Amino acid sequence: MYGLAQVPVTERTMLEKDEALKPANMVTGRLGGRYVGRNRKWQGIPSLTRTRGGRLYVCFYSGGEGEGAENYVLLKKSDDDGKTWSEPVLAIDPAGNVRAFDPCLWTAPDGRVFLFWAQ
């Protein structure tokens, strides 16, 4: 593969230079700070999926004043057909100057739930 100047581009050099190509960090534990509902100024692009067992998952993105590198993706679940929902968990918050947006949930035919997003 070659870059614009016909210079060979390897996977390694691409990963070193483009923050968006680095895998997102997994986050566990309780949410605090900017992730807490009272500190979120907006949220958008919800996606919903249902598992074989009936559990609903919804995800959406938020963070910062609008679209930008402060964006992250949150995930909630419901076991009563959406009457009540869990507190959100942080699913995606890329490091560096990378925006996470447009999340999409999908339940595969084998029952696994996938979360896709753009960054």
Question: Model-derived features: where do they sit?
Answer:
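Asp-box/BNR beta-propeller blade signature and adjacent active/binding-site loops
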Residues: 3-119
